[in-house]
Amino acid sequence: MKCFYSFLFLLGSLLASGQTTDVKYLSGQGSDDAVEWDFFCTGGRKSGEWNKIKVPSCWEMEGYGTFNYGHDKPKADESGLYKTTFEVPATWKGKRIFIVFEGSMTDTEIKVNGKQAGTPHQGAFYRFKREITKLVHMNKENLLEVKVNKMSSNTSINEAERQCDFWVFGGIFRPVYLEAVPNNFIEYTAIDARQHGELNADIFIDKKLSDIKAEIEIKDVQNQTIGKITSAPINEKTGKISLSGKIDNIKPWSAEDPQLYTAIITLRQKDKVLHTVTDRIGFRTVEVKPKDGVYINGVKMRFKGVNRHSHWPTTGRTTNKQLSINDVKLMKEMNMNAVRMSHYPPDKHFLEVCDSLGMYVIDELCAWQYPPYDTKVGTILVGEMLKRDLNRPSIIFWANGNEGGFNFDLDPLFPQYDPQKRAVLHPWALSGNINTVHYIKYNSGIGNMFHGRDIFMPTEILHGLYDGGHGAGLDDYWDLMLSNPLSAGMLLWDFTDQAVVREDKNGFYDTDKDHGADGIVGPYREKEGSFFTIKEIWSPIHLPEHYLTPGWDGRFEIENRYAFTNANACNYTYRLAKINSLAQKTIQSVSGKIASPDIRPGERGYLQLELPSGWQEYDFLYVTVKDRYNQELFTWSYEIGTPDRLANRLLPQEGSTPAVKESIDNWYFSAAGTEVTFDKQNGLLRSVTSGGKAIPLNNGPVLISNQDIICKSVEYKQVEGNPQLIATYTSRNGKNTVYTFTWTMLPSGIVELDYNYRPQDMVKMAGITFDFPEKEIAGATLLANGPYRVYNNRMKGGSLNIWEKKYNNTITGESWDYPEFKGYYSLFYGMKLDCPTPFEVYSGKEDVTLHLFTPAVQEQYDPKRNHTIVDYPKGNLSFMNAIPAVGTKFGKAEDFGPQSQPHRARGNGPENNVSGKLYFRF
């Protein structure tokens, strides 16, 4: 950000010189400072009369017109009439004046003082300008009138921009301003700045002049001049001025180290300065080497990215610079390095933030699917997009449409404008020597994709929907891509849930059912569980899974997955934690620094921890890595002890001799104020009381199984003075023992449950389950991997810790109270359930997953075709050894890799059985 503020200071200094471009905003610069204009809507809500509206804005979000999602048919076709007044600064006398629109949906007709300013513009997402020099009054108020037709008179624009899978709006949704330039001015510049300082630039001026030259001066972030290049005379045939030279001692731009410079371009006629413009540039080289890879500054890349719409729930497509900063920071927090502009060029400030904070960008010409823009209007829009965005170092690819919305006649225009000759992609197709195929299944391809000879980089993959996709399956996909030399990475679909606040529906958050609920974050950027899964998997410093033993020497093998950064640029710390109760404030910790290892990009090495003596007595180890900017890459957590060790330390051991009673139907065990009732016929828990108060835990442990089993016997006995009840279940024919469990009442009142079962082969779930009424629950304190729930193909991203969770009935993507309460929690150690009579339960075995109630099913989507609804046990509290994976919007879970498959459990001996132990403290 230091680069950005230095640029603003420099720009302000130049504007004072008098030969620059002066700017006066007629609107706000974004949704956070919008200005009111007069407005008349021709149809829908609040139509038929003049009112006020904020500019910029989408008029539907301001209470006017009719909402439409892109799939709606037919669509509303109202128009908006705008009026405002403005004055022209006296200092602009003698200059040429233009009115500039950064974006207007869709056909836009401009009048100044009753006279039309040029031809109407068609196309929503593109900056356009019209000269109004002869239409304005210099010494009195001017009237601006704008008519915006939501539906274009050009059918191809409606097909490309409005028959689509996103919200479609109407209105002047980006800023409007006046520009004043000298009579002879620089129209735009096209700069190619390479990694070693080579610089080539084309300067385009508004009209041919004689004796014209240009100069580029390069200044660093300290505003020090580091080099200048002077042009040859203007090329009379092309009307452009070309410069070529080399700037020494530059630092190349990359997403890891986004070094920016200020380019000051001055147009001269002999010794007279005609016009000066500035731009921020970065020196970097992008190469696509066919059948090899994509290289940035000579280094082969794998892009870790996401698709992003320009969207905010209360303002639609109208955003602001702070929102762009926040979004890029969120992407970088997930350790992403790339973003695709789906499916249109974004706000200018978003690209500027990508330049400043460091993101690789695919900038896209709109066309959601077939048909695309026609060639006539498409030619205009390509020019408008590239003239605005050419010099952004963050942009490494152009995209001509999406998923079949390709007008191939427009492809040659991109290199005509772009001296960098960046590849032009056709997202979902093979183009620019890159296969951008969408939504590929794991390890798929015959002669292509994972099994081809072309570079492949899916520009959409692992389609999110509700709580599915994104991080689910990513671990397997990413490992496979890392092993494939032709993989250039991937871009997830998509960044944020596209919900709009419908004031016409009492503030309902509308995602158009399942169409817009695709995000890694919610409409207000609420983080879903996949956010942290992605963060761990895409961390550029990678720590593998590791099981700590008492004799461990404190050394981790780690991998540096940065492209340019040595591992010693990062900071490393550890923390040891000892759990003394299920309360955060009782955690006992000790922490320390770890020496930063010297590991070059792409190589492996070792991280050596110097742990204090007695570290083995702690329960968990946390290792945190922060980048050179002190931003956390990830914190990994590791088990030191076992759940059984922790449970025995936390639970009371003393008490009174347990009592036993028997009736015709039940056994009753009691000790230390706790009484439990078991069914004589099946051994299942029937009721619990503690201190005379009922705890409605019952009907368990039921084996989670599709097997037809029967209870063969329930046996009572005493072991060391403690009553036990042993239940044995067999297959219906009685030949094979399938399941046994043993209840033991301890003197402390702790009820111990030991169980052993033979799992079936090829199952989604395995474990035991109990009933407990959901209406009793206020929350829970978990000692487990959290705070988000997991699926079998989305285990990463959490942390072993104490998590205090309030009850909610969140439906991911329909309500956004995160983290969700219900679901699966891995590495379960213990839990205190907050209910009228709270109780605790602890695991005595590793690798148990808690099923904490069953999430509600989405209300807005047909469950028969929803691959993001997973299976849960019939009970509400379950202790699992196998849980299901979750799918994506377009695919069932089994399509997405090894972790997404049903669980295999083939084996013949008792060693293949699964055993577990639970301690209940009622």
Language-model features: where?
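Beta-strand-rich binding/interaction modules
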Residues: 112, 198-233, 239-241, 554-593, ...
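Substrate-binding/catalytic cleft of secreted carbohydrate-active enzymes
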Residues: 328-331, 338-529, 533
